[in-house]
């Protein structure tokens, strides 16, 4: 059986660990990078009917869609599995960042924001609490439409490598705004599991893998 997973550089450890666990259980895991194109490709593979489970760990494309970054996947991300009835785990991974190109390509209106230079061609901008509230509302709205078995997992300590404590995108208020909005807008019957961990902690990655197996 084929499982698809969404990954970013900042969620590599989480996806890698979950992938190992699932492969040991006999699944084939195909990883898609959440670059806009990657998210759309994953959605279309799910629509094709070849996928048995979805490990949607990286939701970052919504931040680009909302704020105007360069890696948006369009307005239909997180729809295919719900419509196709495919069991899904959803994590709001990397909703702490918007992707831009070289620093001089970042719109002037964001000049006062917090940035991280991932490499000379990639500039990341920290989402603020207001944006995170809206992202939580958008993601919850997509999940509310699922007819498939779905569980939402929240890593309360960090949504990426660089938002962990001591790192440049650590922002408790922004993360809390996101988590609160997801909880507030989700239908009550949708299961939400919280873990006091960072997204790349092996315990959280194993929780992702086990939770998907439980749904399948």
Give the ranges of each region predicted by the language model.
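Metallocofactor- and cofactor-centric catalytic cores in central/energy metabolism, strongly enriched
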Residues: 1-91, 100-102, 113, 124-216
